[in-house]
Structures are given as C-alpha cells and as structure tokens.
Amino acid sequence: MANIDLKAEKGQEQLNELLANKSYLQGYEPSQEDVAAFNQLNKAPSDKFPYLLRWYKHISSFSDAEKKGFPGIPTSASKEEDDDVDLFGSDEEDEEAEKIKAERMKAYSDKKSKKPAIVAKSSVILDIKPWDDETDMAEMEKLVRSVQMDGLVWGAAKLIPLAYGIKKLSIMCVVEDDKVSIDELQEKISEFEDFVQSVDIAAFNKV
C-alpha cells in the first residue's frame, strides 16, 4: 500500500501521524482503502499509536458485509497518474498537519502562560512571651509589627493571661511560603530581647 508496510512499526507510525487529524484515510467516510489497510494490519496496533488504534477499533466495529459496501478507492484518469497517487497523503498534507499541531501547541502554551500562578500561603499564629509582668506589651506588639518581609502580612493580635499577672502576645500573620521563612521571622522577633523571652508557633495552617 503506497510502499508502506503496515506490519512494520515504521509504517504504523506513518499511518498514525496521518490519522492524527482525520477519521478515515480518504474523505469523510470509510472506503475500501480503510479496509485494505485494516486487513494489512491484521491485529490491533500498540497503544503508543493512539490515532491508529482509534481508527482500527472504529473500522473493526463494521461487519464484513458493511465493509464490502464501502466505496472503492477513487481511480485516476490514467494508470500513470494512479501510480503517482500517495494513498497516505502528500508532503504538503504532512506539513499542514504539522502546522496545525504546532498552532495547537502554541495556543495551549499561551493559555497556560496567561493562567495566574497559584501562590502558596500559610496562616500562622505566634505566641510571644515577655520576660515579666512589667513588660510594655503595647510597645512589644508595635516592635513585632515593625518586622517587615516581602510576603508577610500581619493580622489581629490579642493578649492572653498566663500567670502572676504576665500576659503573652498572640498575633496572627499570613505568609507566602516561597518568600517567608518562619524560622527567620522568629529570629527577627527574638532580636527585641529587652521585650521578648520566646517566640512559639501556636498554629500553622495552609490557606
């Protein structure tokens, strides 16, 4: 069949490429050319040739009687012209198929690139303990909020009683995981050593 051996993997690969954007070998309905190729294959091709496998399953769904009723392969005006017919498409058709494939891939890539990237964020509650009950908690909160990092947003805060009149500062923040290291944030807060005794993570949740 047009010098293509469909029992060889190379021939099956060529036919698979041809069927990438069409349902039948010729035109918009099955023909005797489909039957001839089907018979030459003799068995279902590997699933690494998805278009060929789809076509094979479709042709195999027809009965022998139905296959005999398929129209014959179009004949040329002369034997010479017939010999020149490439039953599996011309180079121009291959180029057109490649062009369509390239356009589809470009459209997919453009669509994917325009899709906004998902920014992974976490909601964190920090418990910050002072040294004693004489620590100015309002000033300590002010110092904590003065810590600025790209991807860090401070939220609500409240004072929670501990013991002996001592209160801890419980403060919430939202961080972008790729930009903010919680360990680094804790270290920066701990630098206010005149106010801060310890910094602990009370809660950590993905947003």
From Swiss-Prot:
InterPro entries given in the database record: eEF-1beta-like_sf, EF-1_beta_acid_region_euk, EF1B_bsu/dsu, EF1B_bsu/dsu_GNE, Glutathione-S-Trfase_C_sf, Transl_elong_EF1B/ribsomal_bS6, Transl_elong_EF1B_B/D_CS
UniProt KW Zinc keyword: no
Residues that bear Phosphoserine: S90
Record keywords, A-Z: Acetylation, Elongation factor, Phosphoprotein, Protein biosynthesis
Gene Ontology MF term list: guanyl-nucleotide exchange factor activity; translation elongation factor activity
Single GO cellular component term: eukaryotic translation elongation factor 1 complex
Family to which the UniProt record says this protein belongs: Belongs to the EF-1-beta/EF-1-delta family.
Protein name: Elongation factor 1-beta
Protein species of origin: Artemia salina
